[in-house]
A protein has these predicted regions:
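N-terminal cap/lid segment of alpha/beta-hydrolase-fold proteins
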Residues: 35-99
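Primarily recognizes the serine-hydrolase "nucleophile elbow" in alpha/beta-hydrolase
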Residues: 163-253
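Acidic catalytic loop of the alpha/beta-hydrolase fold
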Residues: 235, 265-269
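Short beta-strand/loop motif that positions the catalytic acidic residue
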Residues: 260-262
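C-terminal catalytic histidine-bearing segment of alpha/beta-hydrolase fold enzymes
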Residues: 271, 275-328
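Catalytic nucleophile-loop/oxyanion-hole region of alpha/beta-hydrolase
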Residues: 117-118, 124-125, 139-182, 303-309
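Short beta-strand element of the alpha/beta-hydrolase
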Residues: 102-110
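Active-site glycine-rich loops that stabilize anionic/oxyanionic intermediates
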Residues: 109-114, 264
Length: 328
């Protein structure tokens, strides 16, 4: 039974509880204000790629947010915008600003399957492609949280990014007439982890990793061409000259023509990631072109540097002409 003498103490405890609760609420509000969600430029809209819950969905570690890199992580003197905790994947369609070639490219930003470098390896790529008359589809694929095992990482460790990629290519092909593109000229382009996703899409298009959702999933998700820049997760860790068997054993005559770029001084993803994939594609008779450079590092995107690799976009444009995607 509560005595009269204990009331002041009880009131004090209750007041402390409400003060703490209010402090937590205010802190959460400040954190939300400091962590904006990425949005594309005006005139462009993110499209949810799944009409309901995404397959293999798991609770995210926290809300999705975007942030800029620090002063020690500049690329060509500029910050990089990264997106974290993506659990609701979207695609954003950027129409050509130049004469429409009918070609479309689905772009996979890199980020180690932990974050997405959405400007360096996303929107800036779309600016280049659309200026060349190519429709760019930027995929914000799921990266639920850093190392949130077992749903973090490259396929087959985690299926979610590949599921999102398969779904997106099918959607683009299904809406080809609406987007004014040729359904037989849809390619994929990715950087780092996104480069691995390019290889996974090039070798895992014959079977969806998820049950069909709608008519778009009846379309082929095979890319008509593939471009991988400084890809990771391809060479075996114990033997860097050997291609990961999950990619190697799925290379067939239907694997699309492929273009590879990497630097020998890449300190994140070993140059053998590209070399091992190149050899496997060549041995399988797949048209493949590879450019290796002595210097240039990792994660340079399209930003101009002093190194020769900075001219890679022109090489890709020439290659697209040689494989019949655009006029030479």
């Amino acid at each position: 039974m509560l005595s009269i003498s204990s009331l002041p103490e009880t009131v004090e405890i209750v007041m402390k509880f409400f003060v703490v609760a209010l402090s937590v609420a205010l802190t959460s509000s400040r954190l939300s204000a400091q962590a904006p969600v990425w949005q594309p430029a005006p005139g462009h809209t993110q499209i949810q790629i799944w009409p309901g819950a995404a397959p293999d969905a798991r609770p995210a570690k926290g809300p999705e947010f975007a942030k800029s890199s620090g002063k020690d992580d500049l690329v060509a003197g500029k910050q990089v915008i990264e997106i974290d905790n993506v659990s609701r994947p979207t695609m954003t369609v950027y129409s050509p600003t130049g004469k429409n070639t009918g070609v479309a490219v689905v772009v996979f930003p890199g980020g180690g399957y932990q974050i997405l470098a959405i400007d360096l390896e996303g929107t800036e790529v779309c600016d280049w492609l659309t200026a060349k008359g190519i429709t760019c589809v930027l995929l914000k694929y799921r990266v639920p949280a850093p190392r949130s095992a077992p749903y973090w990482g490259a396929y087959p460790q985690s299926p979610i990014a590949l599921e999102d990629a398969q779904r997106t290519v099918g959607l683009v092909r299904f809406h080809a007439a609406e987007y004014h593109i040729d359904p037989n000229k849809i390619g994929v382009l990715g950087f780092s982890a996104g480069g691995h996703l390019v290889a996974a899409m090039s070798t895992h298009f014959d079977r969806r990793l998820y049950p069909n959702v709608d008519a778009a999933d009846k379309e082929s998700c095979r890319p008509d061409f593939a471009v991988a820049l400084y890809p990771g997760h391809l060479a075996m860790r114990g033997n860097l000259s050997e291609l990961n068997p999950d990619i190697r054993t799925h290379i067939t005559r239907q694997t699309p023509p492929t273009f590879l770029i990497q630097d020998e001084d890449d300190h994140v993803d070993n140059v053998n990631d590209s070399l091992s994939y190149y050899v496997a594609l060549k041995n399988a008779g797949i048209p493949v072109e590879m450019h290796l450079y002595a210097q240039g590092g990792h994660a340079f995107g399209l930003r101009r540097t002093k190194f020769p690799v900075t001219a890679w976009p022109q090489l890709v444009e020439t290659w697209l002409g040689t494989i019949g995607m655009i006029a030479e």
